[in-house]
């Protein structure tokens, strides 16, 4: 398995453990998606289709299809991908994506869920710093794992 694929799978595993092991569905659907897309990605426009609701980003022509009962954490995940693309960074589940994901969760859901998600990333040894942030020392990493 490539390092890229392993990183993708570990990111999915961390978010799945955060939101589904706690029986969190958060089915806010379209209103949440519309609010998030409007607040975070002004270039995006919401259009409806028979399969769900499609958000179209004109910058990269990326489509996100959300059902009317999409859990809010899935909406946050997709918006984090959109924020990464707006910065012209490579797609995928890298540390900048995970940082955006935590930030969007904090804005859209609550600091509680953002904290739980960051702890899941810590448990999976997945980094989520912006590139300009200082790396943590070994002592800081150990403290984060056991706190």
Predicted regions and their residues:
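Walker B catalytic acidic pair
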Residues: 78
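Active-site-proximal or metal-binding-adjacent scaffold patches in catalytic folds
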Residues: 1-73, 82-147
């Amino acid at each position: 398995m490539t390092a890229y694929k392993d990183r993708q799978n570990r990111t999915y595993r961390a978010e799945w453990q955060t939101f589904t092991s706690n029986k969190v569905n958060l089915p806010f659907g379209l209103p949440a998606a519309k609010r998030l897309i409007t607040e975070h990605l002004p270039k995006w426009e919401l259009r409806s289709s028979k399969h769900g609701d499609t958000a179209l980003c004109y910058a990269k022509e990326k489509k996100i299809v959300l059902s009317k009962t999409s859990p809010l954490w899935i909406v946050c995940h997709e918006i984090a991908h959109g924020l990464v693309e707006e910065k012209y960074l490579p797609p995928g589940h890298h540390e900048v994506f995970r940082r955006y994901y935590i930030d969007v969760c904090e804005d859209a859901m609550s600091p509680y869920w953002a904290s739980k998600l960051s702890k899941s990333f810590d448990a999976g040894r997945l980094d989520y710093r912006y590139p300009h942030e200082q790396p943590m020392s070994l002592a800081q990493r150990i403290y984060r794992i056991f706190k």
